[in-house]
Amino acid sequence: MLPLLAVLAFAPAPLTPVVVRGFDHFYNLEYSEALAIFRKAGEANPADPQIDNHIAHAILYNAMLKAGALESELVSGSNAFLRRERMNPTAEEQASFDNAIAAGFRKAQARITANPRDAAAQDSIAVTYGLRANYNFLVRKAWLDSLKDFTASRRHAQLAVDADPGFTDTKILLGLHDYVVGSLSWSYKLLGFLAGIRGDREGGIRIVEEVSAKGLNNRNDAKILLAAIYRREKQSAKAVPLLEGLIAAFPRNYLFRLELAQMLGDLGEREKAIATIDAVADLQRRQAPGFTKIQAEKIAYLKGNLLFWFDEYDKAIPELERAVAARDRIDLNTGLAACLRLGQTLDLMNRHREAIAAYQLGVALAPDSEIAKECQRYANRQYKRNRIV
């Protein structure tokens, strides 16, 4: 569900009951409700920089949800995260995010100036840098600026742990950074090396696992991150119990259920995977709490995609066609993916003329996107699926 560069909800001291309530909304994808609570908490605690981080976090993730950028497909495949389309938050969202980030920096830096070994302040500013790194990449597509903030985030997280080794929650940043850089291609990894981040994929995973078991406030964040990492590492069996626990804790979060379906599909458990998708569709039809935000056509794409991987092309096509027909109404990433997958499915059935029409819809939807380029390539040359023996 989460991109690996995303920053999680850190706080070294136990969260107040009010903030805990805000994060219950947050993890249930109810970002407007979470934001309202965080802002009230900020009014009651105006000197706390972490609350400004919570506000920025909710604003960013709300924009990511609307853009279809929270699914773990961001971290599957060959650095698919680096190919994501640029997000376009509103001017109000951008201003609110910038204001929260500025306040977080100002308050944390004042404490660090007074006491450089203030672990809580170092932790807070590490999160602020990380949030801005995420924003620089997803919204501005400013890779170098993002890398600078990414590096600063790690540096301050290390200072927090050095000042207080008991800050287990803060270690998630170190593990996240190690895993991300350790997973990058050599060209990107070179930039990380020059910035002082060498990367350690296995070590990063171990650190995140430690936080999931021993963290104070970040256990849920670590579990979410581990589920995405395990899928990327082709260890989906490890992710299933994590997601089942998250679904029980946050039943209104439809993404956890959709991710579970994908994990089950990875494991070859076709019936369970399809049943999980169908259960989400049923909740959406009944307008169950939390399921009014997901469109039926997005669910159709995900089901069609699962059927594609199970070689059930005849069953996949109507689901994918439903998503393609709604390509202008669903999020851009899903719309593009649906056009591409429908074309590929038709190609595998030797219906290339129909496939070309699907590919052309993808090209027209976002001509400069990476997926549009892929669509154009298959329009010119029929898609052939590589089999792993």
Locate predicted features.
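"A position-specific structural signal for the A-helix of alpha-solenoid helical repeats
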Residues: 20, 54, 61, 124, ...
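Amphipathic alpha-helical segments of tetratricopeptide repeats
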Residues: 43, 155, 162, 212-213, ...
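Alpha-helical linker/edge segments of TPR/alpha-solenoid repeat scaffolds
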Residues: 62-89, 139, 181-189, 235-238, ...
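Short coil/linker segments at helix-helix boundaries
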Residues: 13-17, 21, 25-37, 47, ...
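Structural signature of alpha-solenoid helical repeat scaffolds
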Residues: 43, 113, 145, 162, ...
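Residue signature of alpha-solenoid helical repeat architecture, marking inter-repeat boundaries
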Residues: 12, 46-47, 51-53, 116, ...
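Terminal, low-structured helical/coil segments at or just beyond the last alpha-helical repeat
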Residues: 213, 217, 299, 348, ...
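TPR alpha-solenoid repeat register
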Residues: 51, 121, 170, 221-222, ...
